[in-house]
Every structure is written in C-alpha cells, then in structure tokens.
Amino acid sequence: MKIAILSQDPKLYSTRRLREAAENRHHDVQVINFMRCYMNITSHQPFVIYQGQRLENFDAIIPRIGASATFYGTAVVRQFEVMGGFSANTSQAISRSRDKLRSLQILARKGIGLPVTGFAHATQDIDGLIETVGGAPVVIKLLEGTQGIGVVLAETHQAAKSVIEAFRGLDANILVQEYIAEAKGTDIRCFVVGEKVVAAMKRQGAEGEFRSNLHRGGKADKVRLTPEERSTAVRAAKAMGLRVAGVDLLRSNHGPLVMEINSSPGLEGIEKTTGVDVAGKIIEYLEKNAAPGKTTDRIQY
Ligand SMILES: Nc1ncnc2c1ncn2[C@@H]1O[C@H](COP(=O)(O)OP(=O)(O)OP(=O)(O)O)[C@@H](O)[C@H]1O
Ligand SMILES: [Mg+2]
Ligand SMILES: [Mg+2]
C-alpha cells in the first residue's frame, strides 16, 4: 500500500513509530508536513502538491493533526479523501472531536455514561449552573484548555462561584462538571483501533493532585479493563465516527464515564507503558480496510 502520514514533525515518537511499523510491513510510506501542502480543488483531477511534487494514488492516510492545526489539517485530509484515499480518521470525525461540547452532546445522545455536565458562556445564574450538576464540589474547565491547564476543582459552592465569575470576566467558554471523587486522581486511557481497545493504561496524578495528566506529573501503569469499560470505549469512538481514538474514562461508582476523546492520541505513553505495538495495530487496521479497490469511504461533508 501507499501510505501518507500527515504530521508536522517526522521526529515525533508517534510519527517515527508509525513510519517504522508501515516499513516493517513493506508499505511505501511518506511523512508529509500537511501545513506545507497546497491543493488543487477541481472535480476532474484533484491533487495535493508537496515540495514541488504531486501527491497521488495514496491508498491510506494517517492524520496526526495537532489541535492548533485543525482547520488546515482537516482540509488536507479531506482533499486526500476526495482523491479516494482511506483515512485512519475522517476529516469530519476529527473536526467533530475537536469541539469538547459537541463531543459530549453526541455521546449523551447515544446514551454513553458521562459526568453530569453544564455549559455556559455568560450566564447570570451561576448558582443555578452549579446546582444543575449536583452542587459543590465541581470541576470547572475552560473549553479551550489542554494538558490539564484550565481544569479547576472547586470544593465549595463559594469557590466554584468565584472561579466561574473569574472565567466569565475573561469571556471564556466553560464546562461545569460533577466531580468524580471516587476516581481518586486517576483516569484510564483506552486506545481504540477499529472496533477494539488494543491497549489501555491507568494514569495517576501526582500526590495531592486530582488531575491525572502526565504533563502535570502523573504516572502511568498497565490496567485490566472490565468488559463494560471496553464496550464503553468502543461505543464512544464509534459514536464520534473515529476509527483511531484515545478514549479517557473515569471509574465512577455507577460505572465508567467518558471524560474526553482524542482523535490523534499519542503513542509514546501507551506503547511504553503496555508494551503493545500500537503503531502496528493501526497499520494492520489500514491493511484490512484500505486495500486497493476497498476504499469505499462515502463521506458526507
Ligand atoms: N469530572 C471530573 N471528575 C474527576 N476528575 C476529573 C474530572 N474532569 C477531569 N478530571 C481530572 O482532570 C484531568 C484533566 O481534565 P481533562 O482531561 O478534561 O482536561 P485536559 O486534560 O486539560 O484536556 P486534554 O486532555 O484535552 O488536554 C483528567 O485527566 C482527570 O484526571
Ligand atoms: Mg485530558
Ligand atoms: Mg482533550
């Protein structure tokens, strides 16, 4: 197969591993910095130009699109789709997953367990907002936050109110969420490929920290998932239309709750923690679904 990895940095662990896994299986693989491509949008012979070279006839694409490059990145993925390539994640699913609020709404509609969540931009009724999610303690999140920054635990109603007022003063969009205390600062990253969880790890926040992000000093370990956790992760990825996804779960007293879903999940933490060849699993998935003549993606834009 001819495979394109769309990545801004060939040196990143995830990019290197995907290239290596494709080469080990004798595929013709090219890493393409999608930010430097340009496209010809025409119905007859659409194409992508990169480094003066016309990119054509790719069987499969692996998008590794960072959050800050979503707009142009998904446009390039879409162009490869228009040309008939099978993408490990469709442009549409990537765009959808980048909006945290939209993602929660889609998951809720499918009946997937979520922490009770309220959303607000500029409400005057802060007391009501806090009460809708069950009252303090609550977790308050900036919609644009990442790596745990912009996620606050407010232990009392008064603290929650002050934090919400402060964010409102900054004109920020926020989520207010039921605090899942029984998760005890841990979450579970399920790596989904196709309709399977191929690897999973438990992340534990540093001492006294409720956020489990590795960027905030958390550490990761192998974990055994319950059948319910597995099926929740698979159903969540499917609801989002993602073929490759990192689904983060909280273990609550009433079962697994989906916290968020990532469409370009990193490979380093999960491979090093579990010893699973996740990159290989992604290439295998493409082999099964993107074989020449099998690229039957019929995407509605
Ligand atoms: N409702 C909650 N109850 C308990 N703990 C939570 C809750 N929401 C978040 N956390 C903890 O805080 C951490 C960070 O929250 P979250 O993953 O929502 O934001 P983020 O990590 O900043 O976003 P991203 O993963 O996109 O970078 C989670 O990994 C989890 O450990
Ligand atoms: Mg997170
Ligand atoms: Mg996220």
Curated annotation (Swiss-Prot):
UniProt xrefs under InterPro entries: ATP-grasp, ATP-grasp_RimK-type, ATP_grasp_subdomain_1, RimK, Rimk_N, Rp_bS6_RimK/Lys_biosynth_LsyX
A GO molecular function held by the record: metal ion binding
GO biological-process terms attached to the record: protein modification process; SOS response; translation
EC number(s) given by UniProt: 6.3.2.-
Entry keyword set: ATP-binding, Ligase, Magnesium, Manganese, Metal-binding, Nucleotide-binding, Protein biosynthesis
Annotated residues for binding of Mg(2+) 1: 248, 260
Binding site residues for Mn(2+) 2: 260, 262
HAMAP family, per database record: RimK
Protein name per UniProt: Probable alpha-L-glutamate ligase
Species whose genome carries this gene: Picosynechococcus sp. (strain ATCC 27264 / PCC 7002 / PR-6) (Agmenellum quadruplicatum)
Gene name of the encoded protein: rimK
